[in-house]
Amino acid sequence: MAASVLNVLLRRLPYFSPFRGAYGVQVPLQTLCTKAPPEDDSLPPIPVSPYEDEPWKYLDSEEYHNRNGSRPVWADYRRNHKGGIPPQRTRKMCIRGNKVAGNPCPICRDQKLHVDFRNVKLLKQFVCAHTGIIFHAPYTGVCMKQHKKLTQAIQKARDHGLLSYHIPQVEPRDLDFSTSHGAVSATPPAPTLVSGDPWYPWYSWKQPPERELSRLRRLYQGHLREESGPPPESMPKVPLTAPNEATSTEQAGPQSAL
């Protein structure tokens, strides 16, 4: 009875209750406009490592030896994956902002480990001592971000001479490759150059037919001074005159004309 009376009053006076629930219950305005309380369980920031500037000192500390001993940092690490076959690639990164993924990789789980080209003891743990090949990421379990940093740091350490690597020695063979194949041997001269003939056939002298010569003689009769013959073997050399002599001859020419 009381609920029906309340519903009638709410219908007749709608301006008193602008917000009503599903069952005609008035909702206070303050409840809808208040902000959510701040989250108290926010993640704390990642602490700064004391070995950030000198990361090689951490591998000589007592804390590191108590944690890992003489084994590599990835020796006891096991990946979490679905199924019996692990994926061929590890995760992209373990730390995104302040959020750390579950079961982080061997480097990301220890905040005092820093990948640096001067940290030779750490880099040697990810390089095969017999072949000098860098271990793959699925073998060590590091994420792809740290694996990329390790590859760059190892290459930089080798360039600076901090990390030794094997260079295979190749003995020269007895076979001389410069004459064993036509593609790498010396190019032989052209047959025409060996015989002394010109490179192109139209450069060589060809005697015109006698019928054509007689026709030209009749056509240019009285204008021919000498008959044509084969070209000389070498062009005559013109003596070079000094610039002083050339100017003197040019000056003497107009004077003689006058």
Curated annotation (Swiss-Prot):
Transit peptide listed as a keyword: yes
Subcellular location: Mitochondrion
Keyword Cytoplasm listed: no
Alphabetized Pfam families for the sequence: Ribosomal_S18
MF term (GO), any: structural constituent of ribosome
Residues recorded with modification Phosphoserine: 49
Region (Disordered): 221-258
Residues of the signal peptide: none
InterPro entries per record: MRPS18B (IPR040054), Ribosomal_bS18 (IPR001648), Ribosomal_bS18_sf (IPR036870)
Keywords: Mitochondrion, Phosphoprotein, Ribonucleoprotein, Ribosomal protein, Transit peptide
Biased composition (Polar residues): 244-258
Family annotation (SUPFAM superfamilies): Ribosomal protein S18 (SSF46911)
Major location category of this protein: mitochondrion
Domain of life, source organism: Eukaryota
GO biological process: mitochondrial translation
GO cellular component terms, semicolon-separated: mitochondrial inner membrane; mitochondrial small ribosomal subunit; mitochondrion
Transit peptide, start-end: 1-35
PANTHER family: MITOCHONDRIAL RIBOSOMAL PROTEIN S18B (PTHR13329), SMALL RIBOSOMAL SUBUNIT PROTEIN MS40 (PTHR13329:SF2)
Binding partners and assembly: Component of the mitochondrial ribosome small subunit (28S) which comprises a 12S rRNA and about 30 distinct proteins.
The family this protein is said to belong to: Belongs to the bacterial ribosomal protein bS18 family. Mitochondrion-specific ribosomal protein mS40 subfamily.
Protein name: Small ribosomal subunit protein mS40
Organism field: Bos taurus
Lineage: Eukaryota, Metazoa, Chordata, Craniata, Vertebrata
Gene: MRPS18B
